[in-house]
């Protein structure tokens, strides 16, 4: 019984030392700097999308009379603003799909394809 306790204590002590030595291992500062830069650029874009999603999910404030319009019904205006925000969040100039008219033809590698 005594040897089992001693063996368990030694095992836990060795595991604690192994974990401590792994976490205290030196890291390359260039690698850390590269990872921070890449995460910062991706993080800003993800953070902006997150905040935009939060804004879209919040119910509109009916207390604010400055935003109310007499021209459009309240629901239609909210839908229009929401669609515009979603389009601006999801669109990027390099990846925006081309809008084509119905029935147009596209010449691709010696053949015509419909759009």
Curated annotation (Swiss-Prot):
Write out the ranges of the annotated region (Disordered).
60-79
Q: Which GO terms describe its cellular component?
A: extracellular space
- Signal sequence: where? 1-24
Say yes or no: keyword Signal present. yes
Q: Propeptide positions in this record?
A: 25-99
Which domain of life, per UniProt?
Eukaryota
Set out the biological process GO terms recorded for this chain's protein. Answer: regulation of cell migration
Where in or outside the cell it occurs: the entry states: Secreted
Does the keyword field hold Disulfide bond? yes
Q: Which GO terms describe its molecular function?
A: hormone activity
Q: Which UniProt keywords apply?
A: Cleavage on pair of basic residues, Disulfide bond, Hormone, Secreted, Signal
The UniProt function text for this chain reads: Somatostatin inhibits the release of somatotropin.
UniProt-recorded name of the protein: Somatostatin-1
Natural source organism: Pelophylax ridibundus
Q: Which gene encodes it?
A: sst1
């Amino acid at each position: 019984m005594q040897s089992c306790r001693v063996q368990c204590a030694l095992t836990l002590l060795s595991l604690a030392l192994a974990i401590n030595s792994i976490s205290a291992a030196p890291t390359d500062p260039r690698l850390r700097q590269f990872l921070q830069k890449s995460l910062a650029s991706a993080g800003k874009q993800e953070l902006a999308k997150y905040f935009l999603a939060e804004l879209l999910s919040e119910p509109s404030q009916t207390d604010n009379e400055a935003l109310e319009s007499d021209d459009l019904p309240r629901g239609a205006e909210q839908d229009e603003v929401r669609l515009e925000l979603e389009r601006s969040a999801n669109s990027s100039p390099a990846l925006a799909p081309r809008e084509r008219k119905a029935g147009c033809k596209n010449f691709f590698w010696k053949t015509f394809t419909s759009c």
